[in-house]
Regions:
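Secreted/periplasmic proteins
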Residues: 2-120
Length: 120
């Protein structure tokens, strides 16, 4: 009886701990690489890409989601709206419009380490 009880407690504990996600892997918050792009074609949401607007691409966040993006190198932040899918390069979490990249000081480097947080 005690062995069964211990087995059940161990199974429940393992299941509970394995379902917890670290903050960085939650789709609403994260850190990783970002790049910028300035296409003039349509985005995955169907709107025309405008490099002068504060927008970004993310693999899974809903279109229209507002996200605060902070450049980890200089602390500068910008709020962008998700309107596209991507990036599809390992280690990158966001593709920013040129205007958004300019606001956080990453146009010349092309890429930067960023953290992002969903705000609405």
């Amino acid at each position: 009886m005690k062995k069964i009880r211990r087995s059940i407690i161990a199974a429940v504990t393992i299941a509970a701990c394995s379902s917890m996600l670290p903050a960085e892997s939650y789709a609403g918050n994260g850190c990783g690489g970002a790049s910028w792009y300035a296409l003039h074609s349509k985005t995955a949401s169907g709107e025309r890409m405008n490099p002068a607007i504060l927008t970004a691409a993310h693999r899974s966040l809903a279109f229209g989601t507002k996200v605060k993006v902070t450049n980890r190198n200089n602390g500068r932040s910008v709020v962008v709206r998700i309107n596209d899918r991507g990036p599809f390069i390992r280690g990158r979490v966001l593709d920013l419009s040129r205007a958004a990249a300019q606001n956080i000081g990453m146009v010349s480097s092309g890429t930067a380490k960023v953290c992002y947080q969903v705000i609405s």
